[in-house]
UniProtKB/Swiss-Prot annotation:
One of the Pfam families matching this protein, by short name: Glyco_hydro_47
Stated name of the protein: Probable mannosyl-oligosaccharide alpha-1,2-mannosidase 1B
Signal peptide, first to last residue: 1-18
Enzymatic class: hydrolase
């Protein structure tokens, strides 16, 4: 929310992405990649020991949580990274688990959004990889075919959520009673971060129902009504009426709640340029409008650039870790469209988010931050003057977005600086978040030792943080076709 973050990248990055030039000696690159693989295995081993087959490890108390309906979210979300790392043992464990999941059974409400990006996206990306560049990793092909069947099973369980007057789905649903939470609106990111996975499911199965459902919901976002729902070309509000499909506000943001809608626009175009040219046009409009209307430079650090929010004629000078995928989105779009101006702006956004890491005591960025010089807390004036931002929420819950954008910057430019930024971020996460059994979130990234620890290891640690850190340093990865490489990446989401 990706909340995202996260987004799932079944999208294929164009082969026009510049392949990075090796700067470190090969043995140094290999040692970094090995360190990331060790951290992944450490988190996986703790999960298997204390939490499997539940959703997530509680890495402080060495227990388990079931925040994602008890279907084993960490296992499913970890699949594509285990494949990229070529860890056949873990891949086999995950495939055996997925085969046993009954997606029709849970005692809790189901989030259509979270279930799509973690479970459906995890299975489909694993399927594509094991059918393609990693086909040699699993001998029993029936286990690979099972991934698609389970994806279809899950889609069939969830699809009633779209049965509304407009086709805009409910997000929080009861799969047993086919009920919902009674919401009257759905969020921009929640509605707009389904279409890639559901379209891919249709393309793989030949059943067009999944694509039609998700694309009908998306259609309201591509042609927003009323006009107040689109304050600037391409930039739309954050809530949509489930009854009518009309926008109910004009609050514009790249933050959580809106973020991955913009992420998926470009990824849909990359996935299939012929079918989804309109998505590209809407992304370009949003990207250009953001440069014109949302780009903001802190008074104390005018060299930095962030994207502000907008509501009813006013800019909000605050942002989130979640929004830091924005640099990567600009870099992807700029590269695919051969737009140097968008690449340059994307690198500015990457540099801005990099400072939120470089300037804290832990070297890890906060959940949210601001740069309004009129609202600087008294105890953060020195930080604001030096760094160009102040911390609003100092939490870090193992989010991937900053490392994600560093990865894109390295892939697009080949500059060592961005690879080193990925490594530094990984080292700090390994230093401050690591526990005996896994990795825990931090309560305050700008406190000594990160303050306290949150007793939760989110599944996107496996799916995104470890994947981007590994792909940045993996020996020989630069020779892997860029399209196949990004097929393995799950982004905001």
């Amino acid at each position: 929310m990706h909340l995202p973050s996260l987004s799932v990248a079944l999208a294929l990055v164009s082969s026009s992405l510049a392949l990075p030039q090796a700067v470190l000696p090969e043995n140094d690159v290999s040692s970094r990649a090995a360190a990331v693989k060790e951290a992944f295995s450490h988190a996986w081993d703790g999960y298997m020991k204390y939490a499997f087959p539940h959703d997530e490890l509680l890495p402080v108390s060495n227990s388990y949580g079931d925040s994602r309906n008890g279907w084993g979210a960490s296992a499913v979300d970890a699949l594509s990274t285990a494949i990229v790392m070529r860890n056949a043992t873990i891949v086999s464990q995950i495939l055996d688990h997925i085969a046993k999941i009954d997606y029709s059974k849970t005692s809790d409400m189901v989030s259509l959004f979270e279930t799509t990006i973690r479970y459906l996206g995890g299975m489909l990306s694993g399927y594509d990889l094991l059918k393609g560049p990693a086909a040699d990793l699993v001998e029993d092909r029936t286990k690979v075919d099972m991934l698609l069947q389970q994806s279809k099973n899950l889609g069939d369980v969830l699809k009633f959520a779209f049965d509304t007057p407009s086709g805009v789905p409910y997000n929080n649903i009861n799969i047993t009673s086919h009920g919902n939470d009674g919401a009257t609106t759905n969020g921009l990111a929640v509605t707009g971060t389904l279409v890639l996975e559901w379209t891919r499911l249709s393309d793989l199965t030949g059943d067009q129902e999944y694509a039609k459902l998700s694309q009908r919901a998306e259609s309201y976002l591509l042609a927003p009504q009323p006009s107040s729902g689109e304050p600037f070309p391409g930039l739309v509000g954050s809530a949509i009426s489930i009854q009518t499909g009309q926008f109910t506000n004009g609050f514009v943001s790249w933050n959580g709640g809106s973020d991955s809608f913009y992420e998926y626009l470009m990824k849909m175009y990359v996935y299939d340029p012929k079918r989804f040219a309109t998505y590209k046009d809407r992304w370009v409009a949003a990207a250009e409008s953001s440069i014109d209307h949302l780009a903001s430079n802190p008074a104390s650090r005018p060299d930095l650039t962030f994207l502000a929010t907008y509501n009813k004629g006013s800019l909000g000078l605050s942002s989130q870790h979640l929004a830091c995928f924005d640099g990567g989105s600009y870099l992807l779009g700029g590269t695919v469209l051969d737009r140097a101006d968008l690449i340059d702006f994307g690198l500015k956004l990457v540099d801005g988010c990099a400072e939120t890491y470089h300037q804290t005591l832990t070297g890890i960025g906060p959940e949210s931050f601001g740069w309004d010089e009129k609202s600087v807390p008294a105890d953060q004036k020195e930080l604001y003057e030096r760094a160009g931002f102040y911390v609003q929420s100092g939490a870090y819950i193992l989010r991937p977005e900053v490392i994600e954008s560093f990865y894109y910057a390295y892939r697009v430019t080949g500059k060592k600086q961005y690879r080193d930024w990925v490594w530094n971020a990984f080292e700090n996460i390994n230093k401050y978040c690591r526990t005996e059994s896994g990795f825990a979130g931090l309560t305050n990234v700008n406190a000594v030792n990160g303050g306290g620890r949150y007793d939760n290891q989110e599944s996107f640690l496996f799916a995104e943080v470890m994947k981007y850190a590994y792909l940045t340093h993996a020996p020989g990865m630069s020779s892997m076709p860029a399209a196949a490489e990004d097929k393995a990446n799950k982004s905001r989401g």
